[in-house]
Amino acid sequence: MGDQQLYKTNHVAHGSENLFYQQPPLGVHSGLNHNYGNAVTGGGMDAPQASPISPHFPQDTRDGLGLPVGSKNLGQMDTSRQGGWGSHAGPGNHVQLRGNLANSNMMWGAPAQAEPTDGYQYTYSQASEIRTQKLTSGVLHKLDSFTQVFANQNLRIQVNNMAQVLHTQSAVMDGAPDSALRQLLSQKPMEPPAPAIPSRYQQVPQQPHPGFTGGLSKPALQVGQHPTQGHLYYDYQQPLAQVPVQGGQPLQAPQMLSQHMQQMQQHQYYPPQQQQQAGQQRISMQEIQTQPQQIRPSQPQPPPQQQQPQQLQLQQRQGSMQIPQYYQPQPMMQHLQEQQQQQMHLQPPSYHRDPHQYTPEQAHTVQLIPLGSMSQYYYQEPQQPYSHPLYQQSHLSQHQQREDSQLKTYSSDRQAQAMLSSHGDLGPPDTGMGDPASSDLTRVSSTLPHRPLLSPSGIHLNNMGPQHQQLSPSAMWPQMHLPDGRAQPGSPESSGQPKGAFGEQFDAKNKLTCSICLKEFKNLPALNGHMRSHGGMRASPNLKQEEGEKVLPPQPQPPLPPPPPPPPPPQLPPEAESLTPMVMPVSVPVKLLPPKPSSQGFTNSTVAAPSARDKPASSMSDDEMPVLEIPRKHQPSVPKAEEPLKTVQEKKKFRHRPEPLFIPPPPSYNPNPAASYSGATLYQSQLRSPRVLGDHLLLDPTHELPPYTPPPMLSPVRQGSGLFSNVLISGHGPGAHPQLPLTPLTPTPRVLLCRSNSIDGSNVTVTPGPGEQTVDVEPRINIGLRFQAEIPELQDISALAQDTHKATLVWKPWPELENHDLQQRVENLLNLCCSSALPGGGTNSEFALHSLFEAKGDVMVALEMLLLRKPVRLKCHPLANYHYAGSDKWTSLERKLFNKALATYSKDFIFVQKMVKSKTVAQCVEYYYTWKKIMRLGRKHRTRLAEIIDDCVTSEEEEELEEEEEEDPEEDRKSTKEEESEVPKSPEPPPVPVLAPTEGPPLQALGQPSGSFICEMPNCGAVFSSRQALNGHARIHGGTNQVTKARGAIPSGKQKPGGTQSGYCSVKSSPSHSTTSGETDPTTIFPCKECGKVFFKIKSRNAHMKTHRQQEEQQRQKAQKAAFAAEMAATIERTTGPVGAPGLLPLDQLSLIKPIKDVDILDDDVVQQLGGVMEEAEVVDTDLLLDDQDSVLLQGDAEL
């Protein structure tokens, strides 16, 4: 009774509809708790009946449904349930919540209904109640259209079909904007363990009908009219069938249900007549409410059986009245409330945490509560009588039973679990009641109510008691109570329910309202998109349910129902509950999911069945029923609920990635991170242990401190094979650190890094923890013989005179060498020594200077020494063993092996030496670079000495060539400069008289017809009738362009176009090439001025002209080289006497020797010619000269 009073107080607080939402949360929690206690008494049942008006439902329907958002009816519902469910006081929280919801509808009708609302805590806005009152006429008319459309169908529905229809209606209501009504329905009225099972059954069948008529809003009626919807039938058909079988009144209950449903449907479809009839049959809402209230005070005390007959009477009244009362909110609300109260007394608390305790019907009831369409009517229209009696009957009795089943489904869902937990206490009494009819009716009634317009969490909170108290009904109601079906978007089923006849009409007539910001939306997609801004549920209902479960862990927990219902108000203030939005991830839109059978009865509902694993086994019966679950948020735990949702999303989005590098964190020796010294994080060295500040150091001053080693910045034991990965700490003395097996993941030893004086001046006092040691790692200088060098004492400077110089004097310049004439003569000598005329390859200028030193400056004596093959030096001579570069002799076999090794291993002289074997690596290197220097073929640019680009290439090939050359113009210019720089700067050698080249007659002088084209390649002479044929033939010769001239026979002078030329130059210079085909347009022709070749692009001709310049340059260089070679040969012949004669070069003939730089122009041909000349003169060993095959080694791009 105290609880009832609290509920009454809550109801009174919520009596003002404005306060209804804020206070209902508190009231719901308290009411739920008290309802469990009072529900046993049974007085709570009467109170719920008394409240005829539900702010969320039209007054007619709301009267039938006791769904006060606040705690108005909670007290009465709870009282009745407490009376009946004394054993289920703890788990009866859910039942009480349901009862409270039904009572709230009764409470809405009158302040006397405040007691029922107390038992029934559900949050709703006053506006919703006002709307429900205002909707009495308008909504009834709206419902008329629905009733007219679906009247026949509703009449055709049997008791089982009625249950299914109720469930369908609840599902439709979930999908429709009246989701709040469904939620209210889902909030099964707390039914005390029915003292008399038959009375409960009688009441139950009556209640389902009036509950359906009164409890269901237009969407609910529509659902009822659509009994054919399979998903709505799920477990309800069986429960309805079972209702008559289970009790002595089961047959009557189904009949009454069918009749009552038909009446309700008729009344709903024919609101005016029904209202009149309701007015005739009904007792004024206030009277009915007062009666339930009066009954409730007495009923809470009397046993549930006494309350049940009263409730049966009230239900009978309401059964007759509710049929017409669908549009008459107050009478219907009163009857429905009374019937629901009676049902609650008759029906044991069906809300159990245990999934087994919850029958599928109960789970369906919960599913029906989320009806989105009902929410708008629930709020806007005066269908409260209808929704309220329907809610009371179906919600109280059926909702309890359905909660048993739904709670099974919800058991998987945390929200459902919370409801089940609260209903779990009531649930056992229901099972104990064992009234099949009542359970079936409860299932049927709960089917509709379990499609709560309010969030399932909120509805179940009211009925569920302490657990759902956490999920304050206000929290649910704010979601559900709003005229819009936003609360239902929170429930997947309501959103998932087909909008067909119901959803569309509901959406059209009722706007979806955001439960958080109260904004209205015309359709669910808009609402879903808006809900994302608040953080919506996951797109898929299953995901939402899972999230809801995670968000509301207390709800899914089945153990919660067994404990006594926690006081709902303490969990959250009514304002907080009313303001608590549904926890919905932003990424998940709220959708009305079509009901579909699933192992998780509330799988669709986010709150009821987030996951099958969370559901109790008994909830599996509800799998068939599609349940719209709105995550029930324990308002205090809402943020935590959101976190689980995020974690689930993160887990699903998680991609397997390789584990990151594990670097052990630095020792956490400083609890205050701000106090830690500045600078990089340091680790203990694994090679040397830092100086340990231990007592043993103070006691043993002789103990030598270990050397200071700067601590590493990276952990030496970090994962991976590092330099110190296998190093163990070596102990130093008894106080040394124990050795640790350093595995890749072994953290750095817990050593405290102390710094008595840090750079920033902050001194940190370090206190070692258990197992830690203080280590002084302050930078210091290691002192000792091992770390400091021994510096000798300063000596007298006079000691320098006694030191003897250990170097050998090799060269000392004389003052006479400063003479310019003498310098010139020395330069000439060095130039000769750098030529091939002297042994050593002409590169041994060092030997020349040594010889000149020995000759005391006499150039002629030095030159004579140089010309000797084997200079004899005494063993005592300081340079007796001195090796001069280029002085080694290489045999023919060695040169061949060297060439082969060089071609195989390039400049890897170690492998070259292994192949040559007779020479050292140093000799191989010296031989290579010596001859590279002599031959001057190691240039960076490409050499084109004997390669002449084919002038007869096709225009496309020339274009390609042009592009390539255009890409490397700078390279060409650089190479040209290099060539010029390498060309001897000394004056050109005097022209050597050579045989004038015999110029062959022009091609046309050969008697060939002018229209024929002859190939001028050597040993060829093929004649072609067209230039294209000749060009094609020229490709056969490819890069084998051979120079027709004899070596050294071509003068340095530039050849004229008319003269014989190499390659195809003569062909191009012939008149035939200068003529063009008559078909060619002269404006698009670009002929070559040199050879007459015609091009169709100026770029092609420009590229072609480069070939002429290159050919000319190459020919000029060849001529110069040949002339120089001939000059050198003639000079050597003149300067050398007869074989074996020791003659010396006259001093006046030194000017004839070309300076060393002139050697740059030497090539293979010159070297070979010089080799032949020198062989004849027997001046130098030819072993130092390269053979023809050796010259290949020194060509190409090799660099010095």
UniProtKB/Swiss-Prot annotation:
Gene3D superfamilies: Classic Zinc Finger (3.30.160.60), Homeodomain-like (1.10.10.60). One of its GO terms (cellular component) is histone deacetylase complex. The keyword DNA-binding applies. The keyword Nucleotidyltransferase does not apply. Highest expression was seen in thymus, testis and adrenal cortex, expressed also in the adrenal medulla, thyroid, and stomach. Highly expressed in steroidogenic JEG-3 and MCF-7 cells, low expression was seen in non-steroidogenic Hep-G2 and HEK293 cells. Residues 192-223, 256-320, 333-354, 391-503, 529-577, 595-622, 650-670, 954-1009, 1036-1081 are annotated as: Disordered. The modification N6-acetyllysine is found at residues 633, 640. Residues 971-985 have a biased composition (Basic and acidic residues). GO terms for molecular function: DNA binding; nuclear progesterone receptor binding; transcription coactivator activity; transcription coactivator binding; transcription corepressor activity; zinc ion binding. This is Transcriptional-regulating factor 1.
